[in-house]
UniProtKB/Swiss-Prot annotation:
Region (Disordered), start-end ranges: 471-490
Binding site for GTP: 166-173, 191-195, 212-215, 295-298, 324-326
Record organism: Paenarthrobacter aurescens (strain TC1)
Primary location: cytoplasm
Major enzyme class: hydrolase
Residue stretches making up the OCT domain: 363-447
Protein name: GTPase Obg
Length: 528
């Protein structure tokens, strides 16, 4: 089973925002107190964070699908939904985030560095937040938006000061085991090392790391052998150390030809290097400091081969060291030479002026207000596609089972200028309008009543039950009405008394007439 993974495809999804709530306040003596629906909670983000405790991408190889939690729905009494929890994914130092097409999204270097791989969706507004002076009691709320989903590629580039490069079985693993406490797998067959091994070396007061890169062969820059799988691990090192095998038994190999092949492969690979590190542009591989190590001088023919090729290598400008990983011959001098190069590189970084932070490679749209309309043809009929961050987001927030919510969407689109722009591009009533890409929402466009929004029985954002509350009579109005009823009743009694005295009707008729008048007043709600 693999214990080291340096490249994975990760499928990440942010949490979906919670829906807003539609609710009307109810309490004693105030049965309809206005809208009180709370907002939905935002969905959780998926964040990649550099952790010193993580050295491999193995966990994501076994579980590549990661999803943050959703936001909670809004509730009545102005209670908002709970925000989804942020999902933190620890990654090793030196992880590069790319798209499947190879576009670099982020280069994560340094403890605590973060990158939002998938943002959570926005929670929907409740009807309390949607109310205004003109829209006093909305009978709808906005829906929560789904979180971002993306497939990203994580590639680990080892963080080491020195990289050991060379042909398979050149003795790189033996060298790192002899110079540090690392214990890589060592055997007498090619490609024993299948993963980069890191070791820490102490030379005097300087402490640095060296990386044992798996063996390279001719054509590695084009993917042969282990190819690009491990060439990327040399990109961040301050210097390269060529480990040449002086004891090889292969007739077509010698230290000089091995060096020429490795140099050619590194130069070809350097042409494709185009990422920017935290300290600026990376120095090309062929321009970095190099040391040449003639290994296996403890073998009978190894010492002779080293003495034979050393003058030629020194004439080319290389610093050459004859060593033996088995007997530890020459390792002390080699360690101090490495420390000298590492210290010089660190001093150069400290002396360099502070640099401006690198630009964001793919900035996220923030409150983008623009939109565009694209005319298309479908089944020989015109189709107008509306594209833009705001229109697409508004459509996702709309509950299309609620006519009032559809009308609210129509108002927002008209205010943004979508209707005016449709006229300009030649849209006619009845034409098909799509908001969004292939999965967009389809409308039969009518300029004065988009999607039937104007067919509502009441103005958008009103509730008859709540609206009637404002039309109820005041106390003074009730008092005036009561006085008018009493005066009308007194006038009716006086009229009856005048008729009785004039002898128009008898006492029995008067009694029945008075009883009828009394019952009529009781029916009208008079308490007297």
């Amino acid at each position: 089973m693999a214990s080291f993974v340096d490249r994975v495809v990760l499928h990440v999804s942010g949490g979906t925002g919670g829906h807003g709530c539609v609710s009307v306040k109810r309490e004693k003596f105030k049965p309809l107190g206005g809208p009180d629906g709370g907002n939905g909670g935002n969905g959780g983000d998926v964040i990649l964070r550099v952790s010193a405790q993580t050295t491999t991408l193995l966990d994501y190889h076994h579980a590549p699908h990661r999803h943050a939690t959703n936001g909670g729905p809004g509730m009545g009494d102005w209670r908002g939904g709970k925000n989804g929890e942020t999902l933190i994914l620890p990654v090793p130092d030196g992880t590069v985030v790319k798209t499947k097409d190879g576009e670099v999204l982020a280069d994560l270097v340094g403890e605590g560095t973060e990158y939002i791989a998938a943002a959570g969706g926005q929670g929907g507004l409740g009807n309390a937040s949607l109310s205004s002076q003109k829209r006093r009691a909305p009978g709808f709320a906005l829906l929560g938006i789904e979180g971002e989903s993306s497939d990203i590629v994580l590639e680990l580039k080892s963080i080491a000061d020195i990289a050991l490069v060379g042909f398979p079985s050149a003795g790189k693993s033996s060298l790192i085991a002899a110079m540090s406490a690392a214990r890589p797998k060592i055997a007498d067959y090619p490609f024993t090392t299948l993963i980069p091994n890191l070791g820490v070396v102490q030379a005097g007061d300087v402490r640095f790391t060296i990386a044992d890169v798996p063996g390279l062969i001719e054509g590695a820059s084009e993917g042969k052998g282990l190819g690009h799988n491990f060439l990327r691990h040399v990109e961040r090192c301050a210097a390269l150390v060529h480990v040449l095998d002086c004891g090889t038994l292969e007739s077509d190999r010698d230290p000089l030809s091995d060096l020429a092949i490795i140099e050619a492969e590194l130069e070809k690979y350097a042409v494709d290097m185009s990422y920017a590190g935290v300290d600026g542009e990376v120095v090309p591989l062929n321009e970095r400091p190099k040391l040449v190590v003639l290994n296996k001088v403890d073998l009978p023919d190894g010492k002779d081969m080293a003495e034979f090729v050393r003058p030629d290598l020194e004439a080319r400008g290389y610093r050459v060291f004859e060593v033996s990983a088995t007997s530890h011959e020459g390792l002390r001098q080699l360690g101090f030479a490495m420390a000298e190069i590492v210290q010089a590189a660190r001093n150069a970084v400290q002396a360099a002026p502070p640099k401006v932070a690198p630009p964001v490679l793919r900035p996220r749209a923030v409150n983008e207000s623009g939109f565009k309309i694209r005319r298309e043809e479908k089944n020989l009929e015109p189709l107008f596609r509306v594209l833009g961050e705001k229109p697409v987001r508004w459509v996702k927030q709309t509950d299309f089972t609620n006519e009032e919510a559809i009308g609210y969407l129509a108002d927002r689109l008209a205010k943004l200028g979508v209707e005016t722009e449709l006229f300009k591009v030649g849209a006619k009533p009845g034409d098909t309008v799509v908001i969004g890409e292939d999965d967009g929402v389809v409308f039969d466009w009518e300029p004065t009543m988009m999607a039937g929004a104007e067919l509502l029985a009441t103005p958008r954002g009103t509730d008859i039950r709540v609206a009637d509350i404002g039309d109820r009579p005041t106390r003074s109005q009730k008092r005036d009405e009561q006085i008018e009823r009493r005066e009308a009743k007194a006038a009716a009694r006086a009229e009856l008394e005048a008729e009785r005295k004039a002898g128009i009707w008898t006492e029995s008729v008067s009694g029945r007439r008075a009883q009828a008048v009394k019952e009529s007043h009781l029916d009208s709600g008079d308490d007297d």
